[in-house]
């Protein structure tokens, strides 16, 4: 009973302290309660392991195959190895050829299969030297009496072996802590996976509140690949994302098209699979009950749930790391070369997912070295397996490594961009590094990631229940650091946190790059939860009602933790304005607007909106059939073809030159920047019934301006010429306003963001001249945004200029003007890169707006 009371006291103190850790200003005792609870928990866990040690998994052995089978296995392995080497040589010389990639994959498979056959069926588990276990019979066994035949000599009676303390402990373990039957364990795993799926699918259309542009930016890379762009499987793409992930995306798009489901499932599926893989890993480490607890903690973990609901690649490194560790643990237990080979293969394939997998590689190799130090027999028993693991990892990672070797920029560029060394150099001090370390250590229970896409800003990454048991598990793991299982989770969390600690201080704490720590957190929390369960069960384990009551109490604790995560994510986080705004509501609303009108109306989008990746992705229609072809089976998720990425179902809007529109019998809709709400008079010049509307988000903030034009107005205005106000523009080849203009026209207003081929390829320059019609006397503020340079003349004198090439330039000034016309001139040049020119003013008593045609008069 003492152990049970100590464990309950430890949990109570830790839980109470963790609950108030975010409010240490008003609850200064919280850190001390937490520390006291953790220390008391270590003592309680030590007592329970002393008084009632957990049942240990029997060690299995794999026999070395002999004879022909062994020779065939070795031939298969070494044949695969040399095939892989030949493929790597070909990939080094020609990385874009698919036949080399297929040969490389075939060689890896041959190596893994051959290694798995070198060790055969399981040997007797008690072949290890040492004392044999005393046979224990649970329950009553009925003896069958046999009548002795005549002449048969009676056998001498054998004395029943005396039970040892170890055998009695084993008997009690099985009587009062029985292993679940296989069907029971499978049923519980299915229930836990169902919970994990529910947390990751529930209200997926509303939370996150939109598709973030990172999701669709990478998806566009995959669409370019589908369209035939020559991308090596072993190269890198957007933000140095390995192309392996890009090619995986193409599979989703072949099956599901460019749909919302295709984006989300590529992270939901690995998120759920991580829960399953972690269950297997925890079972290898601690047994069935801790495995079920571990999977449950990860199933509803808000940190992992939030990231799993992105359509992005950050969920893959935790999955690959957990799988690799599972095969390593099983390989060490069974001495199976096949498991060692698969572990290296999985970790190597993980390198093709997301950059944070590099931390997983460090975790695993440091763990292997650490285990060799604390377990003297580990390398003696497994040196061949460890060598095979390293070899399989090396040959799997090698093609991507070739890319990094040939172009080191692709290896280190992103790392340098986000490195905390930028802050350290700016501060000329290690203080940013120390502060980042502090923030990451406090992210679990005090203050979490402040990025609204990663977390409810500032909220701890763990709920109080998970957080309390995580701290108890962490303290216990530190105390038992010589136990390689506990040492692993300490290494796992510590190394993974470096991915955030070494990032820019402004991002700290960073939940995105440290997501792979979430499974280790679940392992620690489950370890402490299981030990607490055993401690409470110990004093009354002989009584059924006590066992049932304890089990219900622990299930209630899990349910409470799940509920806290549900409320935090689906209520608090879902209602947060910061979270809503972080998921780019403008891009998402424009995409929904285009999808609703696609095919039924002419659609024109201003240049900024035109290039939004969610719009381009969700409205994509391939130029040729895309899907799956398996012999006579042809399947495509796209119901019709289109113009691909080069020619979407909408056009780029340039209202100054687009009007009047061609008559197609359809209405037309312009989706424009908010600046155009001040230019409705220009639309009404051609279309009296045109209607403009400011589209707002759910918070009431303006997003963009929508103009709808009826088909009848379009037909009536065909051929009409514009004779209103504006500035006379003379367009010249070259950037110095020399020679004859290649184009002269009246531009009603200056809101230009030209595509690459307009108004002419290469450098050009423009001079706009005319009169500015000031409506009243007063102070007028002007702003000219140009890319590249611009000079502004008023009343024959230069009022302002900024003429630096190859960069955006802004001219701002305030002038006192009298009512009436004022001669103005704007000189603009473009050398290369972005092409933009915008002319704004702020008249007295009015908001900032483009200078409209009613206030401009051009002179031929």
Region locations from a protein language model:
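Aromatic/acidic, Gly/Pro-rich catalytic loop(s) in extracytoplasmic/lumenal soluble domains
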Residues: 631-721, 732, 860
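Hydrophobic/aromatic-rich transmembrane helices and adjacent perimembrane loops
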Residues: 307-308, 359, 464, 469, ...
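Membrane-interface transmembrane helices that cradle and orient dolichyl/undecaprenyl
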Residues: 111-126, 130, 322-342, 350
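Membrane-proximal, lumen/periplasm-facing interface regions of secretory-pathway glyco-
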Residues: 207, 460, 466, 544-601, ...
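Transmembrane-lumen/periplasm boundary regions of multi-pass, lipid-linked membrane glycan transferases
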Residues: 217-233, 255, 331, 349-352, ...
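Transmembrane-helix motifs of polytopic, lipid-linked glycan transferases
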Residues: 265-286, 323, 469-475
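Acidic/polar, compositionally biased interaction segments
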Residues: 715-860
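Signature aromatic-anchored transmembrane alpha helix within multi-pass, membrane-resident enzymes
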Residues: 190, 390-394, 527-568, 720-721
């Amino acid at each position: 009973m003492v152990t049970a009371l100590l464990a309950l006291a430890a949990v109570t103190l830790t839980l109470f302290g963790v609950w108030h850790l975010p409010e240490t200003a008003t609850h200064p005792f919280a850190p001390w309660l937490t520390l006291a609870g953790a220390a008391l928990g270590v003592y309680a866990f030590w007592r329970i392991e002393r008084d009632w040690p957990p049942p240990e998994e029997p060690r299995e052995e794999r026999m070395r195959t002999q004879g022909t089978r062994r020779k065939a296995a070795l031939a298969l392995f070494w044949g695969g190895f040399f095939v892989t080497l030949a493929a790597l040589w070909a990939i080094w010389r020609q990385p874009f050829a698919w036949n080399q990639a297929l040969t490389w994959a075939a060689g890896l498979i041959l190596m893994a299969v051959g290694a798995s056959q070198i060790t055969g069926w399981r040997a007797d588990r008690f072949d290890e030297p040492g004392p044999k276990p005393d046979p224990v019979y649970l329950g009553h066994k009925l003896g069958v009496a046999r009548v002795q035949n005549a002449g048969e000599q009676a056998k001498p009676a054998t004395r029943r072996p005396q039970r040892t303390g170890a055998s009695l402990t084993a008997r009690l373990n099985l009587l009062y802590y029985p292993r679940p039957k296989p069907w029971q364990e499978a049923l519980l795993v299915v229930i836990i996976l169902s919970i994990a799926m529910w947390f990751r699918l529930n209200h997926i259309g509303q939370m996150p509140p939109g598709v973030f542009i990172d999701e669709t930016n990478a998806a566009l890379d995959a669409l370019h690949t589908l369209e035939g762009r020559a991308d090596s499987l072993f190269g890198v793409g957007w933000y140095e994302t390995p192309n392996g992930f890009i090619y995986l995306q193409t599979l989703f798009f072949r099956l599901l098209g460019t749909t919302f489901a295709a984006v989300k499932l590529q992270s939901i599926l690995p998120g759920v699979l991580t829960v399953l893989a972690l269950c297997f890993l925890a079972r290898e480490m601690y047994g069935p009950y801790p495995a079920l607890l571990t999977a449950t903690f990860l199933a509803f973990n808000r940190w992992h749930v939030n990231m799993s609901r992105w359509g992005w690649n950050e969920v893959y490194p935790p999955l690959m790391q957990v799988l690799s560790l599972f095969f390593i643990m099983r390989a060490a237990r069974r001495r199976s070369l096949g498991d060692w080979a698969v572990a290296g293969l999985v970790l190597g394939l993980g390198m093709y997912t997301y950059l944070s997998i590099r931390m997983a590689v460090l975790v695993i190799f440091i763990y292997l070295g650490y285990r060799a130090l604390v377990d003297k027999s580990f390398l003696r028993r497994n040196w061949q397996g460890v060598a095979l693991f390293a070899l399989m990892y090396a040959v799997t990672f090698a093609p991507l490594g070739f890319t990094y070797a040939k172009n080191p920029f692709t290896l280190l560029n992103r790392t340098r961009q986000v490195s905390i060394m930028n802050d350290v150099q700016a501060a000329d001090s290690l203080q940013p590094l120390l502060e980042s370390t502090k923030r990451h250590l406090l992210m679990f229970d005090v203050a979490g990631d402040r990025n609204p896409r990663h977390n409810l800003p500032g909220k701890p990454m763990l709920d109080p229940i998970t957080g309390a048991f995580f701290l108890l598990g962490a303290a216990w793991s530190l105390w038992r650091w010589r136990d390689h299982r506990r040492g692993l989770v300490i290494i796992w969390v510590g190394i993974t946190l470096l991915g955030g600690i070494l990032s820019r201080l402004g991002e700290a704490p960073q939940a995105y790059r440290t997501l792979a720590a979430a499974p280790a957190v679940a392992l620690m929390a489950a370890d402490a939860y299981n030990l607490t369960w055993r401690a409470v069960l110990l004093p009354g384990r002989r009584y059924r009602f006590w066992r049932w009551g304890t089990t219900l109490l622990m299930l209630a604790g899990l349910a409470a933790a799940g509920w806290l995560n549900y409320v935090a994510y689906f209520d608090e986080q879902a209602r947060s304005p910061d979270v809503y705004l972080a998921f780019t509501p403008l891009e998402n609303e424009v995409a929904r607007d285009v999808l609703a009108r696609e095919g039924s109306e002419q659609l024109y989008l201003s240049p900024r909106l035109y290039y939004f990746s969610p719009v381009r992705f969700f409205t994509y229609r391939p130029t040729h059939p895309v899907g799956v072809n398996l012999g006579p089976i042809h399947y495509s998720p796209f119901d019709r073809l289109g113009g691909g990425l080069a020619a979407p179902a909408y056009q780029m809007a340039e209202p100054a030159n687009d009007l009047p529109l061609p008559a197609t019998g359809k209405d037309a809709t312009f989706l424009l920047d908010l600046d155009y709400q001040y230019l409705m008079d220009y639309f009404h010049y051609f279309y009296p019934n045109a209607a403009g509307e400011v589209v707002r988000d759910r918070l009431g903030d303006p997003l963009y301006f929508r103009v709808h034009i009826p088909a009848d107005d379009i037909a009536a205005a065909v051929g009409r010429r514009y004779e209103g106000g504006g500035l006379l523009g003379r367009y010249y080849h070259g950037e110095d306003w020399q020679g004859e203009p290649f184009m002269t026209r009246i531009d009603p207003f200056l809101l230009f963001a030209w595509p690459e081929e307009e108004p002419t390829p290469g450098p050009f320059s423009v001079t706009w001249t005319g009169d500015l019609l000031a409506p009243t006397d007063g102070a007028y503020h002007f702003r000219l945004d140009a890319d590249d340079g611009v000079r502004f003349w008023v009343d024959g004198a230069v009022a302002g200029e900024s003429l630096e090439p190859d960069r955006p330039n802004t001219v701002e000034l305030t002038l006192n003007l009298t009512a009436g016309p004022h001669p103005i001139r704007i000189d603009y040049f473009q050398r290369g890169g972005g092409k933009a020119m915008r002319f704004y003013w702020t008249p007295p008593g009015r908001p900032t707006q483009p200078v409209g045609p009613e206030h401009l008069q051009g002179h031929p």
